[in-house]
Amino acid sequence: MLDRIKIALQHLLPKRWLTELAGWGAERRGGWLTRGVITLFVRWYKVDMQEAQQPDVATYPTFNAFFVRPLRDEARPIDADPAVLVLPADGIISQLGPIEGEQVFQAKGHHYSLEALLAGNESMITRFRDGSFATTYLAPRDYHRVHMPCNGVLREMLYVPGELFSVNPLTAANIPNLFARNERIICLFDTDFGPMAQILVGATIVGSIETVWAGTVTPPREGIIKRWRYPQADADGAVVLLKGQEMGRFKLGSTVINLFAGKNVLLGEHLYTRYVTRVGQRLAHGIAQTDSPLT
């Protein structure tokens, strides 16, 4: 009964207004009030502040500064094997596995299509048809910077407007096409293992989504699809990111979806639904192509 009420509220609450209000409040310098809110958040969600570069909550002038806190360098070692792709975020595995034609598994009884997820971008749809995917859910207590699974050259970015449903496991199990309905940023990379998409999905109370090359992408929320193209690795203006390097961040938490093309990326057999993830740990084994797009 309680779960039904929670799902009903997802449809009834003014999600966009709540998200804008939360984003506004999270950027305010509230002095003792900000420190109090952060302290309560740390206690309620059992956040491990000893992993942070600045463990003292008094050092954070705003809630957002706390929320995107950097970790100590040694807190997330990156698997150094060049054939290993690593987990992009702290959280849990929501789902992972093969893309069956153009269908991506969301939860029991629910799939969504590549066409819907990728906003009808035919070139991307063709790349990832019959590929593989991994979906990582970031809970409020988690570290909220997103990192690269492998070396990559950014070739395209799409901003897709949409809903702002919560993306927690309960909502994923009950709202059809959730990740294809929510606001999202789609980042397409060329890698040694073929094309890879890293998709940052918005949600209720996610005040903004940022990337390291473009800064804040949303807000503003203008209701139109936006597209940016980027040059190959050896051209002026190229965006080249290395494995384990930060590529984006959420203010507050949400979901990351990775899409891999073909059969060159073999997801780790040790992974399963609700597996606890940490940045830098093994996600998959990759079979490198002959010609590297990074050279």
From Swiss-Prot:
Residues annotated as site: Cleavage (non-hydrolytic): G253, S254
Pathway: Phospholipid metabolism; phosphatidylethanolamine biosynthesis; phosphatidylethanolamine from CDP-diacylglycerol: step 2/2
Catalyzed reaction equations: a 1,2-diacyl-sn-glycero-3-phospho-L-serine + H(+) = a 1,2-diacyl-sn-glycero-3-phosphoethanolamine + CO2
EC number per UniProt: 4.1.1.65
Keyword vocabulary terms for this entry: Cell membrane, Decarboxylase, Lipid biosynthesis, Lipid metabolism, Lyase, Membrane, Phospholipid biosynthesis, Phospholipid metabolism, Pyruvate, Zymogen
Cofactor(s) this protein cannot do without: pyruvate
Gene: psd
Phylogenetic classification of the source organism: Bacteria, Pseudomonadati, Pseudomonadota, Gammaproteobacteria, Enterobacterales
The species this protein was found in: Sodalis glossinidius (strain morsitans)
Catalytic center residues: D90, H147, S254
Assembly and binders: Heterodimer of a large membrane-associated beta subunit and a small pyruvoyl-containing alpha subunit.
Subcellular compartments: Cell membrane
Bilayer disposition of the protein: Peripheral membrane protein
Main localization, broad class: membrane
HAMAP family reported in the protein's UniProt record: PS_decarb_PSD_B_type1
Gene Ontology molecular function: any one: phosphatidylserine decarboxylase activity
Domain of life: Bacteria
Protein name as annotated: Phosphatidylserine decarboxylase proenzyme
Signal peptide limits: none
Post-translational modification Pyruvic acid (Ser), affected residues: S254
Function statement: Catalyzes the formation of phosphatidylethanolamine (PtdEtn) from phosphatidylserine (PtdSer).
GO term, biological process aspect, one: phosphatidylethanolamine biosynthetic process
InterPro entries listed in its UniProt record: PS_Dcarbxylase (IPR003817), PSD-B (IPR033177), PSD_type1_pro (IPR033178)
